[in-house]
């Protein structure tokens, strides 16, 4: 439904009144891989969990190696393995393939509530060039849990006066991605 049932905005309100769940943006790092690369490729019918992907050493266009911890790559693996171990190189190749095939990655991400300023960043599927709030990123992930249907996040479902009259009622926004 998109309803937020509870959240923690910070550990000590007396020291910091910033609501970190809704207001603080951070790099989502590798947690973008299922949304920005693999989920879209699967939805487009281009890949499945057993699709074999390259995890051989690869460099970005500027010559810097694409790394995973201390490893530059290991060989071939399935998409499921790449996702399970969060390998960077298969995510890079998947995202690159989506762009080369002209898949509307921006459209997918916007339907899940993401505002990404630049889609040409090679490290984007590893979280480079994107910052999100916890609430925004959680809302993107609920789209996966809801079989590709986006439900806009909301905290208040209705406001009711003391006499029982509903003064505000939330209307659910659902969009297929």
Question: What is each PLM-predicted segment?
Answer:
Residues 1-26, 30-31, 48-51, 109:
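Periplasmic/cell-envelope proteins involved in peptidoglycan metabolism and beta-lactam response
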Residues 5-7, 93-94, 125:
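Structural recognition of the beta-strand scaffold that forms the well-ordered cores
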Residues 11-14, 59-60, 88-90, 131-132:
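Solvent-exposed loop/turn segments at secondary-structure junctions
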Residues 14-15, 42-51, 115-117, 146-151:
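Secondary-structure transition/capping motifs at alpha-helix termini
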Residues 47-105, 121, 150, 162-173:
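Conserved catalytic neighborhood of penicillin-recognizing serine enzymes
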Residues 100-116:
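Short, charged, amphipathic alpha-helices and their helix-cap/turn boundaries
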Residues 114-166:
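Active-site-proximal helix/loop microenvironment
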